[in-house]
Amino acid sequence: SVTFAAGEAEKTITVKATESLPMNVEVPLELRLDGNASVNAYAQKMPVASLIVLKEDYEVVSHGVYTNQWTGEGCNCVLQYSPTLDTYRFVNPFGTGVNVLFTYDATTHFGTSVSKQLATGFVHPSEGNVYAKPAALNKNGNNVYFDEANKIWKIGHQWVVAAGSFGADIDTFEVTE
């Protein structure tokens, strides 16, 4: 329960996940104002905030610079690993809240994207939304490769819009720490 003092407009709440909350399962959470609360006399419905709680076990593997070949720009990025899912992810490499998830085989140094298509958040001026699809780097269809000697990850993406493809490029993630 949260109460507001007269004239107070904001409150901070903390939601803690219990040990029994399953890993990697989205759990819906709704915050509702009490039906008796005086919020807006003209409102037809009381305000509701809907959230998703997600308990994850991703750990930071490395920090680096992710260079996106679509824009040609690099950004600071984090590579994480989930032991539960046995999956890696580059966190927010396009600057749009989208993560690049992939599996990886340390013996071959190759990996494969989990997602078949990513919404990059990029918009082409005449073609619209730009999506990234995995683009194979080898004959087995893997689109992720780690060059261990140079500490550089290579990620093959095909850049697609509704009308077709702009072709494939290789994004890079250079490990800095």
Predicted regions and their residues:
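Short proline/glycine- and polar residue-rich coil/turn motifs
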Residues: 2-10
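Short, solvent-exposed charged binding patches
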Residues: 26, 46-53
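Contiguous beta-strand segments of beta-sheet-rich domains
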Residues: 11-36
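Beta-sandwich strand segments
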Residues: 36-49
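Residues at beta-strand starts and edge strands
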Residues: 9-11, 25-27, 86, 151-153
